[in-house]
UniProtKB/Swiss-Prot annotation:
The gene is NUT2. Keywords: Activator, Nucleus, Transcription, Transcription regulation. This is Mediator of RNA polymerase II transcription subunit 10. It comes from Kluyveromyces lactis (strain ATCC 8585 / CBS 2359 / DSM 70799 / NBRC 1267 / NRRL Y-1140 / WM37) (Yeast). InterPro entries: Mediator_Med10. The keyword Acetylation does not apply. GO terms for cellular component: mediator complex. GO terms for biological process: regulation of transcription by RNA polymerase II.
Length: 161
C-alpha cells in the first residue's frame, strides 16, 4: 500500500514537473514574442493562442493539484524553498545549505556529548579514587548514562588502586 502510494506520488511529481516545464517554456516563448512583436494580425493571434495555451495548462495543473485522488496533496514543500524560488534562487542551493547546517549542528552536538562523557568519566574516576565505597553507585550511573557501552564502567576507572 505504502509502496503503491509512493509510486503514485512519483508519477504525479514527474507529470507535474513536465507540465511546469511546458508552462515555463511557453512563457519564455511568449516573452520572445512580446519583445519581437511586429504588430501584425498573425503575430497577435499567435500571442493570444500561446496565452490561451498557458492558461489552459495552468488550469490543468491546478485541477491536478486539487484532485482528491492525487498524491500531491500529501507532498508539502517548505516555505523557505518557495521563498528561494520566488527570490530567483536555485532550490538546490537551499537543500545544500540545509544539509550543511544540519551537518554542522550534528558535529557540534556530537562534540558536546563527547565532552560531557569525558567529564562524567573523569568525575567518576575521581569519586571512586576518593570515595571507594561509592563505586557501585558510580558504576550504576555510568551504566545508565552510557547506552552504547557493554561494560558498566571503563577499565581505567575500575582498575585504579
Amino acid at each position: 500500500m505504502v509502496e503503491q502510494n509512493l509510486e503514485k506520488l512519483q508519477t504525479d511529481l514527474v507529470e507535474t514537473e513536465q507540465r511546469l516545464a511546458a508552462i515555463i517554456d511557453s512563457f519564455i516563448e511568449l516573452g520572445v514574442y512580446v519583445y519581437d512583436f511586429p504588430g501584425t494580425e498573425d503575430s497577435m493571434q499567435g500571442m493570444v493562442t500561446n496565452m490561451q495555451r498557458n492558461v489552459d495548462r495552468m488550469k490543468q495543473l491546478n485541477q491536478q493539484a486539487n484532485d482528491p485522488e492525487s498524491q500531491l496533496q500529501n507532498f508539502l514543500v517548505p516555505l523557505d524553498v518557495l521563498q528561494y524560488i520566488e527570490d530567483g534562487r536555485n532550490p538546490d542551493v537551499y537543500t545544500r545549505e540545509f544539509v550543511e547546517a544540519i551537518r554542522r549542528s550534528n558535529q557540534y552536538q556530537r562534540a558536546k556529548i563527547h565532552g560531557l562523557n569525558k567529564l562524567r568519566d573523569s568525575l567518576a574516576e575521581k569519586i571512586i579514587d576518593e570515595l571507594p565505597e561509592l563505586q557501585p553507585h558510580v558504576e550504576s550511573i555510568i551504566a545508565r548514562t552510557s547506552p552504547q557501552r557493554t561494560d558498566p564502567i571503563s577499565p581505567s576507572i575500575v582498575d585504579k588502586p
